[in-house]
Amino acid sequence: MPHTSKASGRRTVPFLAAAALVAAGACLVSPASAQARPTTAATAATGSAATAAAGSAAPKLWSTQLQFDDNGTPWSVAQFQAIAAKGMNSVEINMPWGQIEPSRGSFDFTELDTELANAAAAGIRIVPIFWQSGWGGSPAAWITGTEVTSTGGAGISPPWWDLAEQQDYFDYVTTTVAHITRNPGYGGAILNYGTLDSQWNDNGDGGWATADIDYFHQHWLPQTYRTVARFNSANGTAYTSFDQVPAAAPGQPLAGVYQDFRQWSVQDTYGRLTAAVRKVSSGPLYYYFGGHLANAPAMGNLPDVFFTLARKYDVTVIVDAAQSPGLALTFGSLANAYHVKLAQEWTAPDDPQMPAQAVQWISNYGMGLPSGGGEDFFIHDGTSKDVIGYPIYTAALPMLQGLKGSYPQQPVAVYVDFSQAWGNPDGGSLNSAENEITALWSSYQSGFTVVTSDEVDNHTVDLKKFRAVLPLNGADANVTAYQKSGGTVLTDGSQLTQYAPSYVDLTSAHALQVVPTTANDHRSAQLVLAEINPTFAYDGAVVVHPAGLDLVPGRYHAVDAATGQALPQVPEADGGSCVPLSTGTATLAEWRIVPGPAPAGTPVPASCSTAAGGATTVSAAAGDGNNGSNGVIFQNVGATGGGSDGNLTVTSIGGQTAYQTWTSAQSGVSPANAYLQLDPGSAVARAGTVNLTVTYWSVAGQGFTAQYDSTTDPYQNGPTVTGSGTGSWQTATVTLTDAQFGEAQNIQSDLRLAVTDPTQPLYLQSVQLSTAAQ
């Protein structure tokens, strides 16, 4: 079996070289405030002409992910041909470091070379995923170090700042890429340092291994602050050496300093890794972004870090979990601001939710245009994802590949403060930011732009170019400066459409979503319509507004892209049209909005409106099948995943079928909740004041608080119900005011019953919600 060896002598980063690397990046940290900042204008530059040109001509990634091989056998030409026949041009394969490099410095490329040859013969390119850890076979067995969490627990990855093992990974990647970069079956490489695609996510928050703390003391602190006196001045301390500065865990004094170091570590390491790969290959490169916006403080997955490096080294960013509109919108805005290609991938849910989530993920692709870099299906592995999700994805590929133009971004910003992730304790919370972006967009179907504090700080974006700014998680210094310079700062999402008009009106926003692509000449548009609710169908109309689509003024009509025929429609005064639409769950459609009135003979419905309607009372009860037939579903019934705060089990107590919440001992998390979703087409879902009636098993010491999506808080505290006695079925009715049910809570919920004592179960028999007029 042939082997390829590294050149003699391991290139471990010595002390001085490592210190120089920190010095080179020290301007990324602000020693004056103990709050690391993202890249400055200088460090955000696109680098040399050679670097900027690398990979620029790479085609879009239309791909599915595969295991490294087919149960020990190389993927065959026939298997790759079957993938190509579905409209894909690439496959991502999960690389097992230990198989490729079974011992330090000794490589076995036999199977990889065979697969590359087979792929090339089928017209497919292979994109290796270079996991450092977290996937089978990575890290290699001869890598022995282990990361440590902030609580002292064992992590998954090697210690981030074990320089010898870090260099081992760098050498594994660069040696492999150098070997395959000119192979016709090679389609680029995905770089992933840390745990999978979520950096510091090591059974919690990694970064407290001895090697990490040593690097913090010996390199980062001296290069950032230069002297202990400057550190003391910035942080109000009285240390006599850097070794005395604690590697503070979250919640402890000086935690922000260590958080700065962790975030800088991601930026520095990915930068050096990418530069090393660019020295051996000009082929396509990719970064995976795993997790969600709320994970940035713990995981270190700051979006702007990856986009800054992607701009410098011509890397495509792949956003995982792109089924989230809030995440896809944010990354689409960033991709367009940084001029970086954006590919999208989903994280598949449980089978019942999979069809609706698949069409949601697919329809979100247009949010990244004109910077769209393709799609990847996770994962073609013979499981239910292949049976349910894969056919939906492959059937939609021709539609996605035919989208031409741009998402119609308006000069209105939804602003997200990310400074908390850099260690600023006063920064805005990111916990609900992504869901709130989703709720804003779903409610108003408006082409606002998402802007991050990092974009403004590194001068990629200037807030002055926006007609209005809506701060999502607090007004920081950037927003204050914008307002002082005459900018308009909004205080509520309902004000968005005054500055960024809706491109469509919907009957029920959280059952249907519409993602537009406007042609470059602004005289036509493509609309991808997705029925995204796994339970509740859409029944109503869609009103199209040319101004929101950024079309030139005039008359337009809607055409079914599949048939080329004009849809039944009623002309609107603004030049758009109202199109009746009734569609089942988890369906996709494409419309074209074209200039001119509808052709003669096009049916004109007698009426067409998105006006409110629907049920004024909705309910659900344990034992009714939880199918939403009465307008409410309990979320996560039968779920068994650890770490979830909303799992429910079907049980029986007091002679009644009931839902039982998991205790904190079962779930491993301290809160316990019962999450509820309302039929978005009901009058209840649109009501501002709602009466909630709950039948529950009453015992002393147990109860619940109704927390609901409101105009100001997705988890607004409503009334608390307190149990009594030793156990009996009781019914309580409370009133929820200022409601705005936008599915902004976890798992797209509208409200939850927060358990008073999560160490004990709460039993629920039924819920009913009625408009206040009832």
Predicted regions and their residues:
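Hydrophobic targeting/anchoring helices
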Residues: 281-436, 497-509, 568-571
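Glycan-recognition and processing domains
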Residues: 493, 499-518, 603-681
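Extracellular carbohydrate recognition and processing domains
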Residues: 713-745
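Polysaccharide-binding and catalytic clefts of secreted carbohydrate-active enzymes
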Residues: 152-322
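Aromatic-lined substrate-binding rim segments of carbohydrate-active enzymes
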Residues: 76-153, 168, 173-177, 273-278
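Short beta-strand-plus-loop segments that form exposed binding edges in beta-rich domains
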Residues: 751-760
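Carbohydrate-binding surface patches
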Residues: 409-446, 452-453, 460-480, 504-552, ...
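C-terminal beta-strand-rich structural cap/linker in extracellular carbohydrate-active enzymes
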Residues: 473, 490-491, 573-609, 735-738, ...
